[in-house]
A protein has these predicted regions:
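Metal-dependent catalytic neighborhoods of phosphoester/phosphodiester hydrolases
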Residues: 70-77, 100-101, 278-286
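Cap/insert and terminal regions of metallo-dependent hydrolase folds
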Residues: 181-302
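Active-site-proximal loop/helix segment associated with metal-binding centers of metalloenzymes
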Residues: 15, 130-222, 229-231
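Active-site metal-binding motif and surrounding structural segment of the metallo-beta-lactamase
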Residues: 38-89, 114-118
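Active-site metal-binding loops of divalent metal-dependent hydrolases
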Residues: 9-10, 38-39, 62, 93, ...
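Conserved beta-strand hairpin/beta-sheet module of binuclear metal-dependent hydrolase folds
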Residues: 1-47, 83-85, 152-154, 200-211, ...
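Short internal beta-strands
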Residues: 85-93, 231, 269-270
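A glycine-rich helix N-cap at a beta->alpha junction
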Residues: 104-117
Length: 312
């Protein structure tokens, strides 16, 4: 299962009930932090999210409302006793950003490993930590903002159903079943047994897309296809603001809803609201008229996604 929590839903400036952009994806004892705007730590405390679980911080771009919480968070993780490595992921210019952040934090008691990601080049999450499910990956995609920017699709695939009968027929000891279930081959009496020999057809996994700041674009639509949850830019509320949204590299409520409908996503959370939007719920009906499963995000909003069982 996969738990997603919105930590910050504000754009440009924090408000009393809205921290700046951040969301956390938790899977077992591991997690990913998407963006790290001002107020991320306090928002995580309020939401009961333990940021020590993060294996990586995934930055969509380097505007201040998405990264100004980073120096403080890195220092806090050190003060809390972190020693294991932390990946810092993002688009081009990450080395310059990391140099500036490191100058602010000073030495840290754990290694931070910056890594530039390129659109369309997946990152296997077991490269960050062995605790992720087999095949879990993070897929960056190009977005349409005023600077180089990325969105992220998190994918947790699910292997086919394990057949104990077939494993026994092949002489696999019970102690080795778990390895096959994790997608690893095993040696049995001088021969190799492959996972495909004891697993059924792959089952539907889970996928979550975090758009960052973006106007609608083909790469975003492709990445959003069949996602269980889209977390989407909704900086502007009204249809008549589409030209303004395009100019600044953002989306309206209606545009994000249209994209979710085209992508056949299951759920849409709107986020990254302009300070001019005092109550996002006032505009929710606009999005829901296009995509009924649209919801207004808020700081602390959370959902646990479960694997779907095949219908008989």
């Amino acid at each position: 299962m996969l738990t997603i929590t919105l930590l910050g839903t504000a754009a440009t400036m924090p408000l009393p009930d809205r921290a700046l952009s951040a969301a956390f994806a938790a899977c077992g004892g591991h997690g990913l932090l998407w963006d790290c705007g001002e107020g991320t730590q306090a928002a995580a405390h309020r939401a009961g999210v333990n940021l020590m679980r993060a294996d990586a911080i995934c930055l969509t771009h380097y505007h201040g409302d998405h990264i100004f919480g980073l120096p403080g968070l890195l220092q806090t993780l050190g003060a809390q006793g972190r020693t294991r490595p932390l990946a810092l992921l993002g688009p081009e210019d990450l080395p310059d950003i990391w140099a500036a952040v490191r100058a602010l934090t000073g030495p840290l008691p754990y290694p931070v490993k910056p890594q530039v990601l390129m659109p369309g080049q997946p990152l296997a999450l077991d490269a960050l930590s062995e605790g992720w499910p087999a095949g879990a990956r993070l897929v960056p995609f190009a977005t349409k903002h005023r600077v180089k920017s990325l969105g992220y699709r998190l994918e947790l695939p699910r292997a086919g159903k394990f057949s104990p009968e077939q494993a026994r027929a092949l002489g696999v000891p019970v102690q080795q079943w778990k390895m096959l279930q994790k997608g690893q081959s095993v040696a049995v009496e001088g021969r190799t047994v492959q996972p495909a020999q004891v697993l059924g057809a792959p089952r539907k996994g889970l996928s979550v897309v975090f758009s960052g700041d973006t106007a609608p674009c083909p790469y975003y639509l492709q990445a959003a296809h069949d996602a269980d949850l889209l977390i989407c830019d909704a900086t502007y509320a009204l249809p008549e603001q589409e030209d303004q949204a395009r100019q600044w590299g953002h989306s309206t409520f209606g545009q994000s809803a249209s994209l979710a409908a085209q992508a056949r996503a299951k759920r849409l959370w709107l986020t990254h609201y302009s300070p001019m939007i005092t109550d996002p719920e006032e505009y929710a009906a606009q999005a829901q008229s296009i995509f009924p499963a649209a919801e207004c995000g808020f700081d602390g909003k959370s959902i646990t996604l479960q694997y779907e069982e095949a219908q008989p």
